[in-house]
């Protein structure tokens, strides 16, 4: 534990461009005092007049006020450091995938969340293997997390009953070996959309039995029956993101989400899913967390027997969303990766541009799944 405290201290030194966390000034109720109210004693009248003058001079505009309520600060956005430069999307594979998605009326979290890796993943990047994360259950979420760019509504359109078949058709036409399926939250549906999710996985498995499937799911409000339905649908990786450290959950996520509920979902998935199924979660950095908080959160996630964890830099989608608190250095990301391996996570992806569905980790996860399959085959043979 002493070593981890030392690591936390070194991580703090590795972080750069962290703005001060001062709270913006707000106008005082003294400005609205009724003139008929008797004045204070003469001795304090001068100080009160000066206070009123200073408050009025420093009073924020309406825009400043709404901004401070929205994000808790009046500071200007931080400039992006050199390591956060993005690649412009392009290439033949990128165009082909985009055209196919439009044709089949499918949505990807890559586009909806404005993922910085969209161009690399869709075009194939260094490996030449194009990857996309399909988003099912529509493109409108019933929740409003402060970091997310997906549009929201209390009453989104009903799910498309043909979507599971369309997803299977799209994936088959791409010839992929590993696919990630995710979804918006659907608190408006009786089963939170878990049945639709499970059906999509099952149709994919029927069409391509050898395909490796990762499902990045919402919390289903912690409903065990919903978690079980998806965990037993035939997937290989059950992923659910805790998004941020325990202490910042209410600041970052929708009020219906919380740390304990997410940990419970990951634990239930491990219990319900067949042996060899991996569980996975992701944490954004740069939301105002401290290294100590990150380490404590990692310990609790590992205690839930989660196999894979990823770390990436939070990037503000628009001015309507919470601001970036700090840009975490690549060196700090590497220290979190090393610590995760030391803690016993089977795989850790950690870097400024890493996202929970980023393809760089899928090759390692694929190898882990195939190793589990080999174990199962060997066990069956010996029996």
Swiss-Prot record:
A GO term from the CC aspect: mitochondrion
Keyword DNA-binding on entry: no
Residue ranges of every copy of the Radical SAM core domain listed in the record: 126-346
Recorded metabolic or biological pathway in which this protein acts: Protein modification; protein lipoylation via endogenous pathway; protein N(6)-(lipoyl)lysine from octanoyl-[acyl-carrier-protein]: step 2/2
Disulfide bonds: none
EC number from the UniProt entry: 2.8.1.8
GO process terms (BP): lipoate biosynthetic process
Additional notes on this entry: This protein may be expected to contain an N-terminal transit peptide but none has been predicted.
Homology family: Belongs to the radical SAM superfamily. Lipoyl synthase family.
This protein's name: Lipoyl synthase, mitochondrial
Protein's organism: Zea mays (Maize)
Gene: LIP1
